[in-house]
C-alpha cells in the first residue's frame, strides 16, 4: 500500500521541510512537496504537528526473561511507543540468565514471543551482549549470533547475575572485541573512590535519607578514574568505546581531548541528568536515585553545552524500572528502610517521558527539533549499527515516524506512564511536547487518547539483523 503523511514540519537530515512523506509498504519511498503528489495517493494531513523520525533508545533495561515482575518486553515496548520510540536496544543484565552466551541470547529471543510464537513487542528492537570477567571466549560467537555490541560494568551492577569486569579481564577481552568490530558500552565508575566516600560517611553516621549523603557517596572521582582508565586502553588498542550515562561534567575536558586525538569514542547522557538537579531533590525522594547520581544545576548546564558542541554524542534513557518495594518509597513497603538512598534501587524509568523531558529543556535553551533528532535518533542508530535502516526521515529507510506537538504543554500524571510500575521523578511536572501518533514501518502502533491511549492490537515488533 502506498500512502502519504503531510506536515508543515518534517524533520529530515536536510532540515525542517513543508512536505509529504510517501510511504510504500514498510519504507519511505520519497519526500516531496505536497502539491507534487499523484492524485491517487491517499494523503493524511497532520496539520501543525511535526513529523519526526522514530526515536531510538540504546540503553533500555527490559529485564526479561527472569525478572518480568520488573518490566518485560510487552510493557516496555508499549511505554516506548507512547514515548515516541520505535526502536529499543535491550541491555544484557537484570534479566536471568544474563546475556553473556549464545544460549542466553536465544533464551532472551524466546522471551520476546508468546506461547504461540507471536511477537510481544510493539516496536522493533536489538540486543546488547555482556562482556564480563572470565567469558571473553563468548564475545565473538555472540557477535556472529547478532548482538549489536557489548556492555560492561567496572563496578558491581546492583543485582546478581551480571559481574563487573576488572582491567586485566578487559584487556583480555579487547582482542575479541576488535575482531568483532562492535562497540563496547561501559558503565564508567570505579569502586575505590566510592568505597572511601561511603566509609567516611558511615564513620560520621551520615543520614542516608538525605540526598546529599547519597550524592557524596558517588563522587565525581569514581567516574573520572574509570573514564581515564578506559581512554588509556582505547588509546593503545583503538577499540570502539562508548561511555554510557555520563553524569559528571568534570570528565568533559578529557573526553574532548580524546576526540580531538581521533579516538573511536562516543558518549551518552540521559534525560534525568539534563533536566533534574541535586538542589531540587528532597530528602527521602528515592524515585530520583540513579547511578551515577544526578549532580548540580551547574553540572547540568555543562552537559548541555557538551551536547551542543559534540563532546557528548547522544541521549539515551537508561530506562531502569523495578517493583515499587525496591525503591523504598514508603514505610508500608519498606519499613525502616523507607527513604534510604543506600537501600533503594538505583534506576529511573524513562521510556514514556524522555522525549517530553528533553524537549522541555530544549525549548528553554532555544534548541531545535533537528538537534533533538540527531541526539535521540540518528546518532543512536549509528552506535547500534542500524543506521542503514532507521534513524532519519529519508528515502529507503523504514517508515518509523512520530507525530509530535512541540507546542503542547501538559502536567505529567500516572496515566502518561505506560511501563509496568508507574513510578517517576517527573510526576506533577509541567512538560512540553506531546506524542500524538507513532508509526512502525508505516503502521500505527500508538495514538494519543488522553487516559485512553490506543495501542495496536497486534504486536509486530521484530529484531534488527545486525551485520
Regions found by a protein language model. Give the residues of each.
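Histidine-rich, glycine-flanked metal-binding segment
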Residues: 1-3, 9-53
